[in-house]
Amino acid sequence: MAPVSALAKYKLVFLGDQSVGKTSIITRFMYDKFDNTYQATIGIDFLSKTMYLEDRTVRLQLWDTAGQERFRSLIPSYIRDSSVAVIVYDVASRQSFLNTTKWIDEVRTERGSDVIVVLVGNKTDLVDKRQVSIEEAEAKARELNVMFIETSAKAGFNIKALFRKIAAALPGMETLSSTKQEDMVDVNLKSSNANASLAQQQSGGCSC
């Protein structure tokens, strides 16, 4: 196995309104679990995972951002050096879908076209409460020239597919000729303290 230090690193920033499931998607991907107890993300959380695929390996740095308005001023600094922006909405919340336009605009303002943007419709398990059709979301993705996928962090639906889709789109990935393992985990869990304004916040973890 190639040493971790040799891996190319890619920064993924998760953006979207509060309670759309950004943290739940990350938690399902990292640990294959789902927490029904909702706790809002405070500021920015950071985790990393090394993915070993059939012919390549990548180190994904996952930055989980708070959706609350009071933390919006912190987000541009995390977007600026990102490789991927994952814009999440709740398929049962039309407003969260409409708001993805401003999230994408914010990413494009900071990064131009030099970033991969993925639109993610989460909570597909809420079948009876769906307010956004897959056809409408696909049309928006085409219009804005971004990738698109629907997921359910609760059911574990399409979570691995989301990250495989991202990995396949990343430039300059290293090739492993002999590695056949998949989804081996190298976890580093931190809470960012780069912003003094977060020092007064009490972090209760994040589960959504």
Swiss-Prot record:
GO CC annotation, single: trans-Golgi network
Topology versus the membrane: Lipid-anchor
Lipid tethering residues (S-geranylgeranyl cysteine): 206, 208
Tissue expression as described in the entry: Expressed in roots, stems, leaves and flowers.
Locations listed in the record: Golgi apparatus membrane; Cytoplasm, Cytosol
Sites where the protein binds GTP: 16-23, 64-68, 122-125, 152-153
Protein name: Ras-related protein RABH1b
Motif Effector region in this chain: 38-46
UniProt similarity note: Belongs to the small GTPase superfamily. Rab family.
Modification type Cysteine methyl ester: residues: 208
Single GO molecular function: GTP binding
SMART domains per record: RAB (SM00175), RAN (SM00176), RAS (SM00173), RHO (SM00174)
